[in-house]
Amino acid sequence: MADTANLEIGDQKYSLNLIKGTEQELAVDISKLRKESRVITFDDGYGNTGSCESEITFIDGDKGILRYRGYDIAELAEKSNFLESAYLLLNGNLPSGGELDGFRQRVAGYCDLPAEVLTSIRSQPAGAHPMAVLSSGLQALGGSYPQYGTNDRKKDLESFDESSALIISAVRSLAAAIYKNSLGEDLSSSDPGRTYCENFLSMMFDKPGESTPVPSAVESALD
């Protein structure tokens, strides 16, 4: 098979490279087309356009395929858990026992939200849309950790492990805080000794000062 596609516009011919994806599907690389021809392509809604090359995920909605780093999502749902899958997406491989323990500890270290972030959430009306409040909460979180968003690419890449752990952990706490705020209740304290999903469920449904056991079946289903 040829590794180029030929395009004719009027009496002009253009040779465009072909890119083969992980599932052997082909794409036409038009990145140089405008420069060479001053012609652009039109794809309403970008339903037929790939935005980037990715080693992280593969999605084919028509066929019901979703893969993370080559692993079928159904296999991960059955044999893995949330933090293992998050580690896979971030690092390209499933973690060893020691790597998972270290990742779990790093994530647990950011479970408690800064006071100013909680204040931001409490300032929102109880009936506000959760996604709008989550967006404002993440913005407030960025203000609490300026060292992770310096706009210095080198520095930000060096702190990527910490900033990713922060977001993974804080989104869970933000979701629980938003739910509690909608009920007019305070957020329950986190427990670093609990698992990721166990902590989330506890923060969602415990009253402040309570520590109710989370049913293992519910935790497992969420994880």
Listing of model-derived features with the role each one plays in the protein:
Residues 2-223:
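Hydrophobic alpha-helical bundle cores within soluble ligand-binding/oligomerization subdomains
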